[in-house]
């Protein structure tokens, strides 16, 4: 007995131990745990609770499957997905007969229109290319379909009777059409079900939503021909117009567009339809295109200072002020005449005292007595015109002989124009006065320009070249950055007269007179060994 009962006792003790452990572990579920196996297994383990608790899968599986109440709605939603399809609480939109970019008579596109753009087809400027065609199709008097019903535009309710009085079929519409186009179907597909749609009779109509035919045609077809609207042709003047003429009284938040100021011309056009009257800018007219262009009146000296850093363009005197002419040719003449008049004050303000005397005397000898200067010549003048330009092939560097207004400094002897004052003074020394104040220290060769001396000094090994004066009675303080001043006023007056007659007698002699020196020559002449 003891040996046979011992395993049972041990087994019972083990089971009781597990039972106590399970009761301590489950804690709050001690009352609930025996109830579920009793219902599922009524005949096997109800009589012996230890044997019932000893069946571990039978006890622990129902206990473990007991979950908190928060997970129960998840199981409920998973089972109801395929069993209970339902409509959304918001009434769905009905299918309209058109979309934004399609004509109103198209029955194929059934995409509902965005309620933000409802009622825009009646405004001027929107779909203006189709207005002439649609005006005959959408005639309110011959329209058998339900009337145009713009939705979601909240405005005065006083317009509702005028909309409902246009036709007797308003009560037959079960759902609204969000486009102003007539709905091709009396009832939509989704309206067959018992779903509550909004009643279009309770909707308000905007003040700009074309309640009548006259309002519809006067806004967008006021400038079109009546024949074009009847025949269905598209007017190009309406298509070209890119401006939107939205009324600011729309309550749906649409912005009121205005004309762009960038497209306005000088005469302030009201619209771009009359684009044929737009004038070109004054700088782009035919005369200026053939001539110097936009920057012709602005030279390089306007943006850079001279070495002397003086005011290059003084204020004009009262006699030099003239009324501005509208023609560009006269404007250029005025500029060139001002340049010739302003040579004297520019030379006076920017040069030294000796340079002032040289320029004044040369100009006076040129303007006061051009004919006597010719009569003083020893050989006699052959040409009647005194100021003759120098040959174009005189210099290696290309110099324009045209009357460029940007070149404000003019030579009085040869009418050559320069952009900078130092260029004009260098021109006087090298060509007209034949001054050579720069002498090489090695070979003793003299030059009229310092850059020519520096170029020549590279040929010598030592490179020694100093600046020496050619004339004895010259004050050393007269040197200004390598520029030598002439000795006296009388000599400069004689220089101007003699050189003026030389230039008038032999026009081609200017290049031969200055060819011995390397002043301003091309690269081929500057590479000479002598």
From Swiss-Prot:
Pfam families: zf-C2H2
Protein localization: Nucleus; Cytoplasm
SUPFAM superfamilies per UniProt: beta-beta-alpha zinc fingers
Keyword annotations of the record: Cytoplasm, Metal-binding, Nucleus, Repeat, Transcription, Transcription regulation, Virulence, Zinc, Zinc-finger
Phenotype of null mutants: Increases the yeast-to-hypha transition rate, enhances conidiation capacity and aggravates pigmentation. Leads to sensitivity to stress. Significantly reduces microsclerotia formation and decreases virulence levels.
Zinc finger (C2H2-type): 409-437, 438-465
GO MF annotation list: DNA-binding transcription factor activity, RNA polymerase II-specific; RNA polymerase II transcription regulatory region sequence-specific DNA binding; zinc ion binding
GO cellular component, one term: nucleus
Protein task: Transcription factor that acts as a key downstream transcription factor in the HOG1-MAPK pathway. Plays crucial roles in the regulation of dimorphism transition, aggravated pigmentation, conidiation, microsclerotia formation and subsequent virulence towards Spodoptera litura larvae. More specifically regulates the expression of genes involved in antioxidation, pigment biosynthesis and ion transport and storage.
Protein name: C2H2-type transcription factor MSN2
Organism: Metarhizium rileyi (strain RCEF 4871) (Nomuraea rileyi)
